[in-house]
Amino acid sequence: MKWEPEIPRWKQVYAVMSERVVDGTYPPGERLPSAMAICDEFGISQVTAKRVLTELRQAGLAYMEPGIGTFASPLPEAPNS
């Protein structure tokens, strides 16, 4: 991944991970990569990876099952136009 120096890395990784949830790469109910797997994929620290997972949960894009992992949340359906 090419890093933008003016944007914090957690925000850049969050953008990638949130897009994967929204576009269905991680469908609802699918387990997301662990913090360690995110570290390996993006070359970031475990603290940064945990921040990404926390931000995904706070945004409603993921939920945690203690002792099991973090999973993609079902997305709200778009209103009919």
Indicate where each model-derived feature is located.
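Extreme N-terminal segment that seeds HTH/winged-HTH DNA-binding domains in transcriptional regulators
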Residues: 1-54, 58-63, 68, 74-81
